[in-house]
Regions:
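Short, flexible loop segments at the rims of nucleotide/cofactor-binding pockets, characterized by
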Residues: 7-12, 126, 166-169
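Short, acidic/polar
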Residues: 13-23
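Membrane-proximal envelope and lipid/glycan-remodeling enzymes
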Residues: 6, 81, 151, 155-164, ...
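Active-site beta-strand/loop signature of hydrolases that rely on acidic residues for catalysis
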Residues: 5-9, 22-54, 101, 137, ...
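Metal-dependent phosphoester-hydrolase catalytic domains
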Residues: 106, 177-189, 196-269
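Active-site-proximal segments of metal-dependent phosphoesterases and phosphodiesterases across multiple
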Residues: 154-175, 200-208
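Structured beta-strand-rich core segments of catalytic domains in phosphoester-bond hydrolases
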Residues: 37-147, 251-255
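Active-site environment of divalent metal-dependent phosphoester hydrolases
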Residues: 13-15, 38-41, 83-85, 157-161, ...
Length: 269
């Protein structure tokens, strides 16, 4: 038996039908999801996010829908902010952040969540670059008889692009500290997410201190985006592992397209 991890920026659930179908059918043991919404009390399916002339449809209660679709998983929602979405001119407060789903056959024996940039914003989305967080979990693998630590992050978005900045260096250092709160000596380690950086980022040097190597670039993949994203460069999402992780299969999934990001699928032992 292998352990399957899928990391995906779900784009606010914009491609809702294929997204839901894929996340059920892929049968992952651990889902690490970025850009997930939750709107307590809302009766709408869709609301609109507005920011400086940009409008995006948001699936209002994607987290709750995923919980219902994945009844065999424990579910965690980890917001970075509460801000306004719109139903016409009506403002509705909504939360936005990470979600993690873990099959219940893998007990969670440790975890930490923390901010890698900024802090929780309760009264609006905040100025760019907006707050970002990370979630780290330690699971026990009954079949193998020892734990594994898994972390994911949504890296900050800078309107100037994906190049390195002092904030991105701090983000990587903060991610390492969150991981160190959870991981024990000897644990296999997987770190993934939409990092919003380029392959030459100092992020990978900093994560390399934990023995991590990126599977996207080291295996010759040059695209983690879908046809819904038309800009260059094509890198945003990464999946890193330590040498004691036996990689059975790794795939930046080209089809089906369920977001403007590709899902990163890892089967490991």
């Amino acid at each position: 038996m292998t352990l399957r991890i899928v990391s995906l920026n779900v784009w606010g659930g914009l491609l809702h039908e294929p997204l839901m179908r894929y996340l059920v059918d892929v049968d992952a043991d651990v889902l690490c999801l970025q850009e997930v919404g939750r709107t307590p009390g809302s009766q709408s399916d869709w609301l609109v996010y507005r920011d400086h002339g940009v409008e995006l449809q948001q699936r209002v209660n994607l987290f709750e829908e995923l919980k219902a679709a994945l009844p065999d998983h424990d579910a965690f929602f980890l917001p970075v902010a509460r801000g306004d979405l719109f139903d016409g001119d009506r403002r509705i407060a909504s939360e936005f952040g990470l979600a993690t789903f873990v099959r219940r056959t893998y007990p969670i024996i440790g975890q930490a969540v923390g901010f890698v940039h900024g802090e929780f914003s309760p009264d609006g989305w905040g100025a760019h670059p907006r707050s970002r967080n990370a979630h780290c979990i330690r699971l026990f693998d009954y079949e193998r008889g020892y734990p594994i630590t898994i972390a994911h992050m949504h890296g900050l978005r800078d309107v100037a692009g994906k190049g390195d900045t002092p904030a991105r260096r701090h983000q990587a250092e903060a991610l390492v500290e969150i991981i160190r709160q959870v991981r024990q000596e000897g644990d296999r380690l997987v770190v993934c997410g939409d990092f919003n950086v380029l392959p030459d980022s100092v992020t990978f040097e900093i994560l390399g201190r934990l023995g991590l190597v990126d599977l996207v670039t080291s295996r010759g993949h040059d695209d983690t985006r879908t046809s819904h994203y038309r800009k260059q460069p094509r890198f945003a999402d990464y999946m890193l592992v330590t040498p004691d992780v036996e990689v059975i299969n790794f795939d930046p999934v080209a089809e089906p397209e369920v977001s403007d990001h590709r899902a990163l699928l890892l089967d490991l032992r």
